[in-house]
Structure formats: C-alpha cells, structure tokens
A protein has these predicted regions:
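Structured beta-strand-rich core segments of catalytic domains in phosphoester-bond hydrolases
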Residues: 35-38, 42-106
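N-terminal, active-site-proximal structural segment of metallo-dependent hydrolase catalytic domains
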Residues: 1-53, 62-65
Length: 106
C-alpha cells in the first residue's frame, strides 16, 4: 500500500499537479493539508474521475485537510479534538487492507 502526504497549499490552485502526481505514482491514499477551500468548492469530481473517494474537512485560509483513497474510507471523523477556534486541521479515517484496519490521521 502506498500512502502519500502533501501540503498542497491550495488544492484548487494545484489540482492539475495533484492529478499528474496521482496518475504517475498511483498512491492508494493521498492525505493533503492546507487545501484552503471550504467543502462546497473542493474539487470532488476531479478525484472521482480518477476513481478516488474523498473525505474533506475544508476551510479557507491556511486550513483544511483531505484524505483521498482508492479504498473505501470508514469510520471518518473530524472532531478528534475540540478546537475552540473551529479550525479545520485534523481528520481521521480507516481503511481495510489485507484483513486489517489501517488508521489514518491527517
């Protein structure tokens, strides 16, 4: 299993670079930080066309995180820590791999 992490510094500004990376390296899971977009403007369709599902905790400015995966994401949550400033900085999901559960924290 290939798991990649990338501080993209704006998913919408870098979507072509991200798609190129996915096509070249085909990671099973890509965890992105600083996506800098709310959920409503996140490019879900770009990832769906590449057969990846998304779990997104979006926010403008320097925040926002996402996990994209070839495998079904289960037990997702974005409230691991109660952040009084409501900043989108951490998400959790699990995937099944070879009869095991892999816990992802991004």
């Amino acid at each position: 299993m290939i798991i990649s992490s990338w501080n993209v510094n704006s998913v919408r500004a870098r979507i072509e670079n991200i798609k190129e990376y996915i096509k070249k390296f085909s990671p099973d899971i890509l965890m992105m930080q600083e996506i800098k977009t709310p959920n409503e403007t996140y490019p879900y369709d770009d990832f769906k066309l590449l057969n990846y599902e998304n779990y997104v905790f979006g926010q403008k400015s320097y925040n926002g995180v996402a996990i994209v995966s070839k495998k079904k994401l289960i037990n997702t949550q974005n409230d691991i820590f109660k952040d009084k400033n409501k900043q989108s900085r951490i998400i959790q999901a699990e995937v099944k791999y070879k009869k095991k559960i892999i816990n992802l924290i991004n």
